[in-house]
């Protein structure tokens, strides 16, 4: 967030900060909509962490004055506080409009321009109109609400302008294909800001969604996959466009792609880039969980975007297959159908369901959210006291359930990286973890080839991996995590995307797995 905010993209303030915040995964409107106790709010204001911006908004919502916030926060500059106070007042205006019955379809053009120009995302506007509904546990706004705001904005022909980054700080003229989106304080012209000369372009334009900021759960390894995917796209004679919001990675170097967009990796920002480019294809499986999480929402938006002239193919594994691999209940059905063994587990959407699942499975349990980065929120719980503490922090909704699994103690864990063209599977490597199962793969040491696995289990791993790739219809890369207890093999999870071990596998084996996977997503076969 600091690296992004320091670039000062977008205007007026605090637009650069809101863009930076939207780039961090958990946003201001996410954090600030929680029913915070007063003491916790004071702590969030006082201690300089990524929670502070959300706390600033909440303080102004509760009627704090600028001097109150300045005193509690230890001296945040008044210049910034005035702007956050203004945004909080504008958010209150949106909320009041919702209380008076305004729906997304009713938003006037003037208000839409002002709200977008101030830095509010479509999701934040939808949430504010709904009054930030909470019910003890965090309640997320429905995607349909955000979709309604986007449709109204497009109906009003309000789109961001894309500005080129001056990479030479005005010392001399420099033309670099770096862009960022801005609504310029609400005065944005109407209509889609297409790439200049787009009608003369002859090559297909393929967009690669990057992995975003490097943080716990999302490392630089995913950027490796994005860079090699771009190389494969260009080798095939297409234009490669990257959307990424991390200025310190290789994928955002000036000569990596044909065009680069420094924008948050959200559905709203990605859709605007796709419209600007009139993109022919998009690759989501190389940017880790951040990118693959866009698969289902983007698939839901495609009919609307196609109505605006976009003829986009979601390259590689289908969004439905991504959901089948990622959704616990669907994958359990898949595992039974294919003949795979999984630890005993349940999906829970309410606190009551979580406790019922734990009682049914018995301690110890492994509990984690679905669709998250790098094991965020994953815990091994051994008693009711630990469960109570975990539930105080849990975010639950039907859209974001918790996965409760039997914990396999004294088990060995394996990682498998592979690629598939839909009919044939190439296994890049089978990696044995040094630590026992339950240590997240991002924190574990692994080695190639495995040293402590019987030939029988090794053959079963290869067989199950091929079954999973072909039966799921994977096109591109995928990663499977297995556990072995005694001579019994279990599937822990399947990730229909590149993994953090891809660079290790490629360098250890000499097989450019990411580049091969990219070519498969674009329609080539392994036999080729």
What are these regions (language model features)?
Residues 280-286:
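Periplasmic-binding protein-like
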């Amino acid at each position: 967030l600091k690296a992004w905010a320091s670039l000062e993209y977008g205007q007026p303030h605090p637009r650069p900060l809101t863009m930076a915040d939207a780039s961090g995964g958990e946003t201001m409107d996410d954090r600030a909509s929680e029913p915070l106790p007063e003491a916790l709010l004071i702590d969030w204001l006082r201690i300089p962490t990524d929670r502070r911006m959300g706390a600033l908004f909440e303080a102004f919502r509760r009627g704090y004055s600028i001097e109150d916030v300045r005193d509690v926060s230890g001296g945040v500059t008044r210049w910034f506080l005035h702007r956050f106070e203004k945004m909080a007042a504008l958010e209150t205006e949106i909320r009041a409009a919702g209380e008076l019955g305004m729906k997304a379809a009713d938003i006037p053009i003037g208000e839409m321009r002002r709200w977008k120009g101030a830095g509010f995302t479509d999701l934040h506007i939808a949430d504010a109109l709904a009054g930030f509904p909470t019910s003890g546990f965090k309640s997320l706004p429905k995607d349909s609400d955000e979709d309604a705001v986007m449709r109204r904005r497009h109906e009003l022909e309000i789109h961001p302008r894309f500005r080129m980054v001056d990479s030479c700080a005005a010392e001399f003229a420099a033309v670099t294909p770096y862009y960022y989106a801005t609504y310029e304080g609400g005065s944005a012209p109407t209509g889609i800001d297409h790439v200049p000369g787009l009608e003369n372009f002859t090559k297909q334009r393929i967009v690669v969604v990057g992995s975003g900021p490097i943080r716990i759960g999302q490392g630089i390894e995913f950027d490796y996959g994005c860079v090699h995917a771009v190389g494969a796209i260009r080798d095939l004679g297409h234009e490669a466009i990257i959307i990424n919001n991390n200025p310190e990675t290789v994928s955002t170097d000036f000569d990596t792609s044909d065009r680069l967009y420094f924008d948050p990796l959200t559905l709203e920002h990605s859709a605007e880039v796709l419209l600007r480019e009139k993109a022919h294809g998009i690759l989501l499986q190389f940017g880790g969980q951040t990118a693959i999480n866009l698969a289902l929402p983007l698939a839901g938006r495609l009919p609307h975007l196609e109505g605006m002239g976009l003829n986009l193919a979601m390259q590689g594994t289908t969004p439905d297959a991504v959901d089948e691999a990622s959704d616990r209940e669907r994958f359990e059905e898949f595992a039974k159908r294919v003949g795979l063994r999984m630890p005993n587990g349940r999906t829970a959407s309410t606190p009551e369901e979580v406790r019922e699942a734990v009682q049914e499975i018995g301690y110890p349990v492994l509990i984690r959210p679905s669709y998250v980065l790098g094991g965020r929120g994953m815990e091994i719980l051994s008693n009711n006291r630990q469960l109570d503490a975990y539930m105080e922090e849990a975010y639950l909704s039907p859209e974001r359930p918790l996965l409760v699994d039997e914990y396999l103690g004294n088990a060995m864990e394996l990682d498998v990286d592979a690629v598939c063209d839909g009919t044939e599977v190439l296994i890049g490597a089978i990696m044995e973890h040094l630590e026992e199962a339950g240590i997240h793969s991002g924190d574990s040491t692994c080695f190639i080839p495995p040293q402590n696995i019987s030939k029988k289990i090794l053959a079963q791993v290869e067989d199950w991996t091929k079954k999973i790739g072909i039966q799921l219809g994977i096109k591109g890369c995928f990663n499977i995590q297995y556990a072995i207890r005694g001579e019994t093999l279990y599937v822990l999870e399947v990730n229909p995307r590149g993994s953090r071990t891809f660079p290790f596998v490629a360098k250890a084996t000499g097989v450019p797995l990411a580049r091969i996977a990219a070519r498969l997503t674009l329609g080539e076969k392994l036999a080729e």
